[in-house]
Amino acid sequence: MTATDTFWELVERTAADHPDRLVLADDFGRTLTAAELRDAAESTAAALTADGIGPGTVVTWQLPTTLETMVVMVALARLGAVQNPVLPIWREAELGFVTRQLDTEVLIVPGTWRGYDHVALAKSLAAERDMRIVLIDHSVDPAGPALRLPAGETSVLPPPPTSGDAARWIYYSSGTTAAPKGVRHTDRSVMAGSAGGVRMIGASSDDVNPIPFPVSHIGGAAMLAAGLLTGMRLVLFDTFDPETTPFAIARHRPTLLGTATPFYVAYMAAQRRHGQRPLFPALRACVAGGAPITPELGRRVRETLGVPGIADAVRATSAPVVGVSPIIGGAVVRGMADHCLPAIGVETS
């Protein structure tokens, strides 16, 4: 696939070239093809225009890792809104801080999810300033293949964005003080690291990559872009229970696993409980992000899961992914080693 300037252009081109390719699945048995993702995003985008969302509207969204969330993310990219994905575990202090700092115009929430009333939180924040609330209801698990999303008439949609260089994504990291640190990204910066990263691990349409982490992390958009670029299928899990989720993931026969130390600890514990037979027999590589992977953990993953090691990419929020560690093999390496990704335009010294 040739390069695209905008996130929406990537979605459109994939849907045109590979309409029936499965790009997303979840643990409820639902799937979305490239064409279904495009169509659902356009319909949702049309519905969101009725809530006053359009080009340049600042939208903070706090949604779990579901098909609906991926569609909302793409719908906002279609509209050219400025989207600010935030972690579902954030509460009044963090969410209040970022919505005030960004002067958020629309806040999208999942309703009551995992026992917490996000609408009540949103209303308490909206009482302090002018901010509209949009509900994407996640209070009940899916009962069938239908998406829990609003739908609208696509004829009302504005033209899609044409520039991939406008800052339309704002991600927050914890930083080094108590206040979250916001980072502005463009479509091109979100997509750049994914394109290089998948070349590094050789992702293809034969790959199945489970996503048990919050897709409101920049890795969510980056992995979706990677899937659209390569045909790699993403399987979404809205929660991660270290006792049960590794076995649920195993049922999808993943070829890739990620993404951070707690997940790998859970995968290895599940493998030990499973016995000598590989729990993940199709697994060929592991990818990490969020925080550096220690050589010791890489060694344990090699020995327990039978893969060459872990390709580690960190600081994705602060800047596009520009380098990943080599997949560690052989003796434990002290310190860190990185390979700059091709076509990123970064020099090291």
For each predicted feature, which ranges?
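Conserved structural elements of the adenylate-forming
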Residues: 37-46, 164, 168, 183-204, ...
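Conserved AMP-binding/adenylate-forming core of the ANL superfamily
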Residues: 3-4, 22-66, 70-74, 91-96, ...
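Gly/Ser/Thr-rich phosphate-binding loop
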Residues: 229, 254-258, 268-336, 347
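Conserved pre-ATP/AMP-binding loop-to-beta segment of ANL
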Residues: 4, 19-20, 140, 151-172, ...
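Structural core segment of the AMP-binding/adenylate-forming
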Residues: 81-149
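A short helix-loop-beta submotif of the ANL/AMP-binding
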Residues: 64-84, 88-92, 101-106, 207-208, ...
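A short N-terminal helical cap/helix-turn-helix that marks the beginning
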Residues: 2-23
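Conserved AMP-binding/adenylation subdomain of ANL enzymes
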Residues: 191-208, 215-256, 270
